Amino acid sequence: MASKRKSTTPCMVRTSQVVEQDVPEEVDRAKEKGIGTPQPDVAKDSWAAELENSSKENEVIEVKSMGESQSKKLQGGYECKYCPYSTQNLNEFTEHVDMQHPNVILNPLYVCAECNFTTKKYDSLSDHNSKFHPGEANFKLKLIKRNNQTVLEQSIETTNHVVSITTSGPGTGDSDSGISVSKTPIMKPGKPKADAKKVPKKPEEITPENHVEGTARLVTDTAEILSRLGGVELLQDTLGHVMPSVQLPPNINLVPKVPVPLNTTKYNSALDTNATMINSFNKFPYPTQAELSWLTAASKHPEEHIRIWFATQRLKHGISWSPEEVEEARKKMFNGTIQSVPPTITVLPAQLAPTKVTQPILQTALPCQILGQTSLVLTQVTSGSTTVSCSPITLAVAGVTNHGQKRPLVTPQAAPEPKRPHIAQVPEPPPKVANPPLTPASDRKKTKEQIAHLKASFLQSQFPDDAEVYRLIEVTGLARSEIKKWFSDHRYRCQRGIVHITSESLAKDQLAIAASRHGRTYHAYPDFAPQKFKEKTQGQVKILEDSFLKSSFPTQAELDRLRVETKLSRREIDSWFSERRKLRDSMEQAVLDSMGSGKKGQDVGAPNGALSRLDQLSGAQLTSSLPSPSPAIAKSQEQVHLLRSTFARTQWPTPQEYDQLAAKTGLVRTEIVRWFKENRCLLKTGTVKWMEQYQHQPMADDHGYDAVARKATKPMAESPKNGGDVVPQYYKDPKKLCEEDLEKLVTRVKVGSEPAKDCLPAKPSEATSDRSEGSSRDGQGSDENEESSVVDYVEVTVGEEDAISDRSDSWSQAAAEGVSELAESDSDCVPAEAGQA
């Protein structure tokens, strides 16, 4: 209770509005000598003298309250818990407590009026009751204030179990203005268990029984009995516990009575220090059967003990709900209506109905505070507007009974409290905007995009493995349990014939999603939390989008430029690009998922209708998620070769392959995506003639030459007999010029390397090759025009500088020849497909 110094500090337990009576100082302390047993009556004077001697010999009765270890005496110093006052004189300290803190019970004593039994420990009183009053539960406790001593007198009543706080003095007698308590069916009356093993008693703690007369009978430690109203036994531990104290509200006569059985045979005090039990009670005071079973296994205690423990804790905290109210509170709690603020938990008791005045409910009669665990407070709340406050060590929250919910957050209110000027009132925080209640994960409605991802995965496998589940978690943002439940439900529906998920229905869904996106205001981040980008203006987003089209990984110079133009920090720009890349990859992956990973290699032989549907799907998705690219950029022969090589291997590259192609070719990613889309359309009509050649040469290197091509060209170069016709025939047949064949041509025509090259057709202008490449954007058969330039470049191993220029000349000549040969045959192959792009 108090700070540890070289003396024990008197137990200070708060009471409320207890009137101090001018009783003669005939009683001060009770001397502890042994275990109390009933003894014959002694005179009142001898008893008073004994108490006075006790107060001199043993200045302070040591108190153990709710897990607080025994205090040691340190040089006779005393320190007040509730204010900075400290002194080395016990009398001055007690006077200070009585005058400055009138609501504190100091060194209470217990007495049994039936047997004249006196003790200072509640354990001794419990042992006495179990021995001499077995099976008796109708006890009446009367609190008497006598100078510096508080007396709790126990008597047996035949009707109700009443705990009342009274005052004794001239003219008052035994007035019963207290907390009346009736019997409860929750806990069976019985004998309390005194666990001597867990709470060993020291010799100085052993108390003798003393005999008193009239109402001046002393009982034990009020802090203990009030903190253990249900017979709870205290342990010497360091965990925080709830320590209620008696406090009379102004409307004490209107407050209903709460049953607090003092004797029970099944209460297990060891559960008071069990962290699992405490956490479970803090979450919800009414455990379900499943929770009880789990707690039984976790705590290694019988289920009946756990039930009794929960019932006692509810009595302590004034929680008494009907089954309907429990169900309602549980639903609201798990539906997310409780917005938890970490240091405070407010427990509101049941609403008082006019017809149920006799319902046993505790209403602020026993306000509680947590000792040793300041981050968690359970506070009683009255049915009226009474404000409950506590010391600065703990945080108490008060409020008004809410008709709609039983455990909401209640805004603390500051109210004057004349009896406790030293207590810090809880300030009222500014009002917060009410958020709509969150729905549980199982009840959240999935978006069309999430369902499309789930259906695409469902088509591949109705029993997804862990890798697929994790991928769906990243793509859809759903929880693992939601994904598992969705798959389970749809497996059941498919087996019963309720739903039929096919590729056609998936394609329709994707088209509908794309159309809805295209129809509404452009928002490039549908799958991400809006708060990440809500602070960016449209102008900032446009600047970022333009930069993203150029490169998804901006350079340092580009980042500096964006920081200047958008006024955003580097972290914000990096985060935006990261989310934008993630969105782009997810959209591309969605196209792959919609057609199934096992179908990627079968697109060539697929029906035209299926390919058309997939192309429409991919086109709609990509055009809706990606802004319109810049005008077509002419590609070099090397870039075209790399694209064709990848296209021959897979017509649907993964996002990683797109990144690799962008790095190798230097092209913008959107251009690469568009090129693949157009060539898939051309492949559908069967007009991509270079496809077969690339498929037959899987081992070709990145430079476009392989052994097969070289062997095919050599015989053609050697066949002509007339040396003057060698070069034109060589070019006419293979339409290629290999560097290693150049020497053979030179020897046959008996000319140098330069004349041999002059025999080839003239080099076309650069604009011709640009036009032939740009024609692919207008649907004029670009891929067939590019067929003649399959060989992009050859790796030069000779030392002549002119060999490189020879190679470039041959490429341009081949491209010009290909334009003239294929312009007519392929002019009608793509108008419709190019128009879709």
Swiss-Prot record:
The name this protein goes by in its record = Zinc fingers and homeoboxes protein 2
Its quaternary organisation is: Homodimer (via homeobox domain). Heterodimer with ZHX1 (via homeobox domain 1). Heterodimer with ZHX3 (via homeobox domain 1). Heterodimerization with ZHX1 is not necessary for repressor activity. Interacts (via homeobox domain) with NFYA (via N-terminus). Interacts with EFNB1 intracellular domain peptide; the interaction enhances ZHX2 transcriptional repression activity.
Q: Does the keyword Transcription apply?
A: yes
Q: Which residues carry this modification: Phosphoserine?
A: S825, S827
Annotated PANTHER family: ZINC FINGERS AND HOMEOBOXES PROTEIN 2, ZINC-FINGERS AND HOMEOBOXES RELATED
Q: Which residues carry this modification: Phosphothreonine?
A: T37, T207
Q: Which residue ranges are recorded for the region named Required for repressor activity?
A: 263-446
Report the sequence similarity comment from the record.
Belongs to the ZHX family.
Q: Which residue windows does the record flag with biased composition (Basic and acidic residues)?
A: 192-204
This protein's source sits in the domain of life called: Eukaryota
CDD domains attached to this UniProt entry:
homeodomain (cd00086)
For this chain, the site of the Glycyl lysine isopeptide (Lys-Gly) (interchain with G-Cter in SUMO2) cross-link is K64, K455
Signal peptide range in chain numbering: none
> Function of this protein?
Acts as a transcriptional repressor. Represses the promoter activity of the CDC25C gene stimulated by NFYA. May play a role in retinal development where it regulates the composition of bipolar cell populations, by promoting differentiation of bipolar OFF-type cells. In the brain, may promote maintenance and suppress differentiation of neural progenitor cells in the developing cortex.
Task: Locate the region Required for homodimerization.
Answer: 195-358
